[in-house]
Swiss-Prot record:
SUPFAM superfamilies: 6-phosphogluconate dehydrogenase C-terminal domain-like (SSF48179), NAD(P)-binding Rossmann-fold domains (SSF51735). Coiled coil: none annotated. Pfam families: Mannitol_dh, Mannitol_dh_C. NCBIfam families: PRK02318.1-2 (NF002646), PRK02318.1-3 (NF002647), PRK02318.2-1 (NF002649), PRK02318.2-5 (NF002652). The keyword Oxidoreductase applies. It comes from Bacillus pumilus (strain SAFR-032). One of its GO terms (molecular function) is mannitol-1-phosphate 5-dehydrogenase activity. Transmembrane segments: none annotated. GO terms for cellular component: cytosol. The keyword Zinc does not apply. This is Mannitol-1-phosphate 5-dehydrogenase.
Amino acid sequence: MKALHFGAGNIGRGFIGSLLKTSGFELVFTDVNEAVINELNARGEYTVELAAPGQKQEIVGPVTAINSAQDPAALTEAVASADLITTAVGPAVLKIIASSIAEGLKQKNPDHIINIVACENMIGGSSHLKEAVFSHLTEEEQKALSQTVGFPNAAVDRIVPIQHHEDILKVSVEPFFEWVIDETGFIGDVPQIDGATFVQDLTPYIERKLFTVNTGHALAAYVGYQQGVQTIKEAVDTPEIRQVVEGALHETGSYLIDTYGFKKEEHDAYIQKIIKRFENVFISDEVTRVARSPLRKLGADDRLIGPAKKMKQPVYLIKGIAAALAYDFAEDEEAVRLQKLRKEKGIEGVLEEVCGLTPTDDLYQAILKETTR
């Protein structure tokens, strides 16, 4: 089977591309990074290193690559002939690649089945991509392609640390990964992908990841910054910070267990697995990188306010939210805007305009109380 992957960056090569190649796919990357594309075509393979003791390496290949900016005709042909298309380009870029995908779909054999999976850090990535692709098609084309093109949603999780290598193709990734795909979104047979998990309902896994990995990472960053530590590992190694992180994850865990039926002992083990990932010295990020974009992360449905709204009386989560509201790293544009808004309109203004809360909300009052202690 043929797989076309949009995005030859570290996540594309080190996570999605690696699994697809291990699963036996004929793999083609497409990207606009000329140096990476040229090197992939020259060598036909690349190295993936596990960011863990021993730093085990594997060679991924053979692979080929297409420069989407310089060779749109080759990209159209690659889309049309692919059995599986995946992306790791960032949510904002999906609408940019949509026109290229649409052009390829129009050129494919009418009976040829293609499934397209957006592997982005967002909810409903494939659905968003479908909407963007279909905006380039006529109603007649949309109707016809809906019979042969699937857009199954997915949840992905793997930390790829900031890294610099002499070899521009080498990529380091953490050993842990999770790629969960909604099997009900496929047209035709569900492909065999080693390491991927196929489920009937993706929502529990999306929320479990968002409210555990993303929430925990953010809390370690914001509380860590507040306490003056430099890295996520330092944060979770500091008892008072770890107490807030673990406490909040058990709060979100209670919601996840009650709502989706996860077994308590299994979810508790999942929390500890996530904490251990944060402790990994090989992938420890600076708190200021993980904390960046606080306005987005304090959004009504994001990793902090989102789970807090679903609970009656969160304690540790509110401590973390208070730390996020105080985040003032001068080199972070959103942090500067956040503190400007806080100075002009107070915490009340931030809670209403950024967090989507109102004074009648219990959470609004609880956060207000925590920030004015």
